[in-house]
């Protein structure tokens, strides 16, 4: 593959993961969960959450294909299942995010910095079923070592943006406002729904081909 092909693959991987992980849409959630803490504790929560989220995605994308092979599950089946979950998630965001409100309520009951960093921030907010599905699919279908590295790099870039959004959360929210961040989240949710439908149809098409239909 030439350089243009690699760049195109990297851009596709990055945009897919960015839309699914949704840094702008999840920023108000992070602010709501951490506003009762001091700046020092917010920094700790942010660092731990982004590192843990990236490690979860990295480990699952690298090992996910092998685990699926062990259980005899195809990537096409993962696409179908992941696409359905992604579509449900996108509808939830478009309708107001009832599950995210539940995450808020549970996190607000905890005073443990480590607990909040792991749940709900790292998992499932920043590394949910959709991100894991996309990571495994992208990594498994990467044709060579360079493409696999580009998938990992695209994930690292997205989580770097997540971290930067936490650091500059105050000016970002001042610029966009809470309603602006909500609008951005809902716009991304439309693209998320499109990705979900594409995953499902790709998976179904691959299933039909494998059955010679």
Curated annotation (Swiss-Prot):
The keyword Membrane applies. This is UPF0056 membrane protein AF_2111. GO terms for cellular component: plasma membrane. The chain crosses the membrane at residues 1-21, 51-71, 75-95, 118-138, 142-162, 181-201. It is a multi-pass membrane protein. It is found in: Cell membrane. PANTHER family: UPF0056 MEMBRANE PROTEIN YHCE. Keywords: Cell membrane, Membrane, Transmembrane, Transmembrane helix.
């Amino acid at each position: 593959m030439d350089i243009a092909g690699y760049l195109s693959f990297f851009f596709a991987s990055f945009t897919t993961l960015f839309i699914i992980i949704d840094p702008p849409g999840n920023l108000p959630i992070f602010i709501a969960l951490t506003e009762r803490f001091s700046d020092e504790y917010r920094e700790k929560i942010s660092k731990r959450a982004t590192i843990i989220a990236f490690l979860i995605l990295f480990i699952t994308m690298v090992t996910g294909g092998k685990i699926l092979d062990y259980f005899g599950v195809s990537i096409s089946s993962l696409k179908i299942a992941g696409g359905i979950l992604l579509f449900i998630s996108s509808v939830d965001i478009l309708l107001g995010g009832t599950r995210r409100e539940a995450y808020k309520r549970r996190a607000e009951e905890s005073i443990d910095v480590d607990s909040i960093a792991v749940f709900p921030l790292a998992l499932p907010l920043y590394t949910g079923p959709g991100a894991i599905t996309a990571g495994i699919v992208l990594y498994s279908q990467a044709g060579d070592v360079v493409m696999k590295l580009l998938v990992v790099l695209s994930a690292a870039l997205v989580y770097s943006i997540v971290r930067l959004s936490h650091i500059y959360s105050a000016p970002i929210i001042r610029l966009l406002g809470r309603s602006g961040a909500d609008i951005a989240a809902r716009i991304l949710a439309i693209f998320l729904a499109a990705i979900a439908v594409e995953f499902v149809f790709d998976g179904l098409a691959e299933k039909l081909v494998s059955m010679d239909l």
